[in-house]
Design a protein with these regions (language model features):
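Conserved active-site motif detector
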Residues: 1-215
Length: 215
């Protein structure tokens, strides 16, 4: 067996949401930049479509035909697929507007899970900081994953160009999201921590408005 996984493939891909209502959930604390999402497949009108679930099992969106095909091929080769949330965006078009986002996708041989997962975890940290490493590289890059234990590509990928009617809403982890993630790591109970923090923030705002004499 080779000591390097040359079958690795990494790329960024857009995903869309079913509706404006469900898409708005991406702005909540259960969908944080750098989080892992599960890729799974559904058959729709004879076509296989790759979908996404967050770490709480909630379906958040789906990929287009081209990306679905790439992921289906990786799945057919028994590769492990990891998806990390790269950003969340909103567009006015098509009417009445839609939430969408981008995932950093990694496909690799599970025999190399230790090295590959460590690399992907480092990329997740970079995404959380608002840094988008270029994950589409050749053999030399793959070899660095196995020879340099802390390696992350220095080359980065830009966000989509700003346009009228389009905005990136979330492209890094906020202070509050970092606190929530720390709570998750301590196994306190993800939902409890998330909602407790939100309640505290709302209460603080209400208190500040009250002190200002607004109510």
């Amino acid at each position: 067996m080779e000591l390097v996984d040359y079958s690795y493939r990494g790329f960024y891909a857009r995903f869309d949401t079913v509706s404006k209502t469900t898409g708005s959930l991406l702005m909540g604390p259960d969908n944080i930049v750098g989080d892992d999402f599960e890729v799974f497949f559904k058959t729709d009108s004879g076509f296989v479509v790759a979908w996404l679930k967050n770490k709480f099992g909630v379906e958040v969106g789906y990929f287009d035909t081209d990306t679905s095909r790439k992921l289906q091929l990786a799945n057919g080769r028994d590769q492990t697929i990891r998806a990390l949330l790269a950003f969340v965006a909103y567009s006015d078009e098509p009417d009445p507007g839609c939430y969408w986002g981008q995932m950093a996708l990694f496909c690799f041989n599970p025999a190399y899970a230790s090295e590959m997962n460590a690399f992907i975890d480092r990329c997740a940290l970079k995404l959380g900081e608002g840094i988008r490493p270029n994950i589409d590289f050749g053999k030399q890059g793959v070899e660095k994953i196995f020879s340099e234990s802390e390696w992350v590509p220095s080359e980065t990928v830009s966000l989509p160009k700003k346009e009228i009617g389009f905005a990136v809403l979330k492209d890094h982890r906020s202070i509050s999201e970092k606190m929530i993630e720390q709570g998750r790591a301590r196994n306190i109970g993800c939902y409890v921590v998330s909602w407790a923090f939100i309640i505290l923030v709302v209460a603080g705002i209400a208190y500040a408005l009250h002190c200002a004499g607004l109510f």
